Amino acid sequence: MGKALKDRKLKFETLQLHVGQEEADPVTGARAVPIYQTSSYVFNNSEHAAARFGLTDAGNIYGRLTNPTEDVFEQRIAALEGGVAALAVASGAAAIAYTLQNLAHAGEHIVAANNIYGGTYNLLAHTFPEYGITTTFVDPFNYDEVEQAIQENTRAIHIETLGNPNSDVVDIEKIAAIAHAHQIPLAVDNTFATPYLVRPLEYGADIVVHSATKFIGGHGTAIGGVIVDGGKFDWEASGKFPSLTEPNPSYHGISFTKAAGPAAFVTKIRAILLRDTGATISPFHSFLFLQGLETLSLRVERHVENALKVVEYLNNNPKVEKVHHPSVSEDPVQQALYKKYFPNGGGSIFTFEIKGDEQTAKDFIDHLELFSLLANVADVKSLVIHPASTTHSQLTTEELLEQGIKPNTIRLSIGTENVDDIIEDLAEAFAAV
């Protein structure tokens, strides 16, 4: 017989179909991953139960912590991102919150890019301070500013591969080097890029998060998030993360770095934060995300192909003031970063400024028929929204401008429809304003 599938070095398109279920279900022979719709699991005996709870025997304990359907999804995402382990949770917001809560505690500090999703900005600027965690927001393209923002109590840098909503490309490798020089990890939100286009761990990132609701699911049918542990950050050598390295009083005095090795980071989130706060993903949503993963590469290729044609159309439209997409950026830094991180193209979520004011932008949106006006992105269907009054409305006028969001800014998420139909819909809306 040939080499077992799990022992082969498989390409991305194969990994997205097979990891976690290299063979049919051993009980039923089902080739599709079954939905294990259960709240709990039977132990063989009392000793077996104690071993599971003590983390000396790996396996299912309770549905809030693990599920076999979820496990396949986690294995597959970890493989696609090149990490050692992953944890799926109830939303992308939960993934980000758990990641940063696992790094910073009361009295500690985070450095974050100022071009991140408005919800994450709000979490860091307003919610975390209530728990004693502060954040300094920096221009991710001003590396001196990034470095100078790091304090003695800083525990992480957080960035997004592509800024939200303008899709500016961040230099992951450069910021990872700054973080590591100060013995802190870099966490990267890779939602907008997907591992098919960029794998941040290969450029020095330590933790990757996703809103699985977006490209991973791809069809707007489920809410979920995922955290991928790169497994390479040396928590013990850093000396800044005692909750990972020292005996944890919340879990029988266990040291997560000793008990879980390279997967210590996500293991602690599962064992402590998920256990205590319960942002658990449902088995059915895990199943839906697995369906999405099976076509991720195919969909992203079409998203990118369509987006680049729409960008070209908008860039030559006399009613457009400016298109914010790295493929047409006049900034030589952005041009170089786009070439480095997106050799096959990228960025199907981007913004443009229509000539006119906020009302012009809203009138344009209201005249679109093919595009759906909603808060999600990365659906196979094309989507549109006015960021200043919706997704980023919690920001002040000054904060909006810092993120490059103006009253006449419109965000598009280009779907997989025929691109001629997409452009026709845009053209009719332009004609109406």
Question: What is each PLM-predicted segment?
Answer:
Residues 157, 225-227, 323, 350, ...:
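Well-ordered beta-strand positions enriched in small/hydrophobic/aromatic, beta-favoring residues
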Residues 228, 351-353, 413-415:
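Short hydrophobic/aromatic beta-strand micro-patches
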Residues 1-3, 125, 134, 152, ...:
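PLP-dependent enzyme catalytic core of the Aspartate aminotransferase-like
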Residues 2-67, 75-76:
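N-terminal "arm"/small-domain region of PLP-dependent enzymes with the aminotransferase-like
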Residues 45-97, 119-126:
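Conserved N-terminal alpha-helix of the aminotransferase class I/II PLP-enzyme fold
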Residues 2-8, 20-24, 86-316:
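Conserved PLP-enzyme active-site core in the AAT-like
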Residues 277-280, 284-286, 295, 300-302, ...:
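Conserved small-domain helix->loop->beta segment predominantly found in fold-type I
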Residues 58, 84, 285, 289, ...:
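Short amphipathic alpha-helical segments
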